Amino acid sequence: MTCYDEFEYLLKITKVKNQSTMSLPAVEPAVAAARRRISSLNSHLCSSSSLSSTSSSSLSTRIFVSDEVQIALRNNIPVVALESTIISHGMSYPENCKCAMEVEDIISSKGCVPATIAIIDGYVKVGLTRKEIDKLGKEGARGDVQKVSRRDIAPILANASLSESSLGRLKLGATTVSATLLIADMMKIPVFVTGGIGGVHRNAETTFDISSDLIELSRAKNTVVVCAGVKSILDIGKR
């Protein structure tokens, strides 16, 4: 039963009760007015699409998609999304960049277009250049790259806007599985490939430490995730 159905049911009950004390002509205008208000309220309470589209459109103004990825998406050429924390936080430089580029080369050799996702120069970038991958790896090795989960996207982009206005230094952001999946799903990239995903941490029954990767997996509608499973450090029995 939707919100509208519930309110309609309540209106019918109210109408029956009021008919004993009010004439029908007096009741009908009140019911009609109530229905109009309920219909308006229903559009806000029972549908998240307007909220989702608003938040998505706000984020889309800070997304930069490479020409290669744009052309591929328009022409139904397979695109594969890749996260960037493996570059900045997973390995030391220059092995991190070498690995990332090798993965992209493998994807390209299979007739697909790689789309590594990161936050660079105040924008979410979908499809990095080799120079940007090298920058992410080099600065990540120095600890100058922020790990960005879904919840961190808005703050880092907001801080980037402030930095732009004050000519401050723009912080680099490497996207985790949840952030990468969010962006890939928005862009309708069909496949996202990664190593291990997050899950339920040990002692989660007291710490409630559960990765946002799992939440994002339940939300994604356009993107499937291909991975090796949850990371071995997690409580795999509670995955």
For the regions a protein language model found, what residue spans apply to each?
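N-terminal mitochondrial targeting presequence
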Residues: 3, 11-60
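Generic N-terminal amphipathic, Lys/Arg-enriched alpha-helix
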Residues: 40-41, 78-90
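N-terminal basic/disordered segments at the start of proteins
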Residues: 60-73
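Glycine-rich nucleotide/cofactor/substrate-binding loop typically near the N-terminus or early
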Residues: 71, 84, 89-91, 96-162
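Short coil/turn connectors at secondary-structure junctions
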Residues: 74-78, 82, 109-114, 151-153, ...
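A glycine- and small-aliphatic-rich helix-loop capping segment at beta-alpha/alpha-beta transitions
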Residues: 94-99, 132-140, 199-218
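Internal active-site segments that recognize and position negatively charged phosphoryl groups
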Residues: 173-200, 229-239
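Active-site glycine-rich loop that binds ribose-phosphate moieties when present
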Residues: 174-177, 205-239
